[in-house]
Regions:
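Divalent metal-binding segments
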Residues: 29-38, 57-69, 89-101, 116-127, ...
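Acidic (Asp/Glu)-rich catalytic clusters
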Residues: 75-81, 104-109
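Histidine-rich, glycine-flanked metal-binding segment
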Residues: 1-22
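A glycine-rich helix N-cap at a beta->alpha junction
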Residues: 77-92
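Divalent metal-coordination and catalytic microenvironments
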Residues: 16, 27, 48, 52, ...
Length: 281
């Protein structure tokens, strides 16, 4: 019970509500600029406020990508109109092509709070290494989408029993596990602050746990759907249950829940990423 400690202007009846500090979502796609037929900064922020979120970090895969100072400033200016904190992450690579580092100094100075090519995995290990060294110098985090396309023939669904039942190959956990292991070790050797995005594999959770034990500055996030659903959801919901990385096995889901409990996973992030109905069909 909160004791009455003085005068007040308003009494809010919060019976049946959860009273908490404003929530923070480190992984949202507001599709602005360039893809605003799906969402924009104003509508995304309104939805965030409705859900109790007062700070969000927007991903960089807009059109154009957030690889330039002008787009960073645009997101900040639009965010200031919303009533919540809208913090832009900028691209690691120019055009999200994975070949050349962005001007991370200038992007940070413009207001970028971190760097990510979310949606596209970075396959150039040398570029990842250089990005981590620069991020360490600037004291900013990097966030990585970990799916090696070399192991994936059909994305959106786990390579497992459900995919086999549907007559497709799917995306194996190996695609995630291999890049998580790589980036955890590069993080260990560079001292960079690295976040593993939307983790979906129990083995990847163990890799993050090991990296932390070795002293790496690594964090991991998980989405609500990856710890509440598994690959069988595709049979019920069809394309609406397809995503990257995919929903995996019940064993993976259990491993993720255990990772939340033991601290291997640090954050629940929504990966709020609206699409049109035509795109999801």
């Amino acid at each position: 019970k909160v004791e009455d400690d003085g005068s007040y202007e308003q009494v809010i009846d919060a019976d049946g509500c959860v009273v908490a500090p404003g929530l923070i979502d480190v992984h949202v796609h507001f599709r602005d600029p360039g893809l605003t037929y799906k969402e924009d900064i104003q509508t995304g922020s309104a939805a965030a406020k409705k859900g109790g979120y007062t700070t969000v970090v927007t991903m960089a895969n807009t059109k154009p990508p957030v690889d330039n100072v002008e787009t960073v400033k645009y997101i900040i200016e639009e965010g200031e109109k919303t009533g919540i904190n809208v913090l832009p992450a900028a691209c690691v690579s120019v055009g999200m092509k994975g070949q050349e580092l962005t001007d991370m100094d200038a992007l940070k100075a413009a207001g970028a709070v971190g760097f990510t090519d979310d949606g596209i995995p970075l396959m150039n290990e040398k570029l990842v290494y250089e990005a981590m060294k620069k991020a360490k110098e600037l004291n900013v985090p990097l966030s990585f989408h970990e799916e090696d396309p070399a192991f994936i023939s059909e994305n959106g669904i786990n390579a497992g029993a459900v995919a086999k039942e549907l007559g497709i190959t799917g995306s194996p956990a190996l695609a995630e596990d291999s890049l998580v292991a790589r980036d955890c070790m590069i993080a260990l050797h560079t001292g960079a602050s690295v976040n593993i995005q939307h983790i979906s594999s129990a083995t990847s959770v163990k890799a993050v746990k090991l990296a932390k034990e070795l002293g790496a500055d690594v964090t991991a996030e998980v989405t609500p759907h990856h710890f509440t659903l598994d690959e069988t959801a595709v049979l019920e919901h069809g394309a609406m249950a397809k995503m990257n990385p995919p929903l995996r096995t019940a064993k993976d889901r259990a491993g993720i829940i255990e990772g939340i409990k033991d601290g291997s996973i640090d954050m629940i992030a929504t990966d709020h990423a609206p699409h049109s109905m035509e795109e999801k069909a």
